[in-house]
Design a protein with these regions (language model features):
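A composition/biophysics-driven feature that prefers long, compositionally simple stretches
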Residues: 1-120
């Protein structure tokens, strides 16, 4: 069982996701990557002061959204997001301030693993 401190009932998040997916379907999108902190909160309940690093919400046409961000911020996601903990994922600090690695490389691998390498 997931323990969360989300601001709204799950049914409200379900309503928001259904509304977003309807717009995605109309636009012909397979996935949406949401980076604005207020929109992340609107979809997932995520409430963290971590917007200074790469983070966002992956929303596909099925299943729970996935909060993706810095590994050290995952605990905040687990406390404030309504989703199952396996849908709160993080990237390592070796991506932060690196000249060799970029967090978007990690994001690309997660998208590819979900069959979205050629998604729209």
């Amino acid at each position: 069982m997931v323990t969360h401190n989300a601001a709204f009932e799950i049914s409200e998040y379900d309503r928001r996701i259904a509304k977003t997916r309807a717009a995605m379907s109309e636009a012909g999108l397979d996935a949406l990557f949401v980076t604005d902190p207020s929109n992340q909160a609107w979809l997932t309940g995520y409430d963290g002061w971590s917007f200074y690093v790469h983070q966002g919400v992956i929303l596909t046409m099925e299943g729970e959204p996935i909060w993706w961000g810095r590994h050290m911020d995952m605990m905040g996601g687990r406390r404030t997001c309504w989703m199952q903990h396996e849908n709160i994922i993080g990237y390592g600090d070796h991506y932060v301030q690196s000249t060799q690695f970029h967090p978007m490389q990690d994001l690309a691998e997660h998208l590819k693993a979900r069959g979205l390498a050629r998604g729209r």
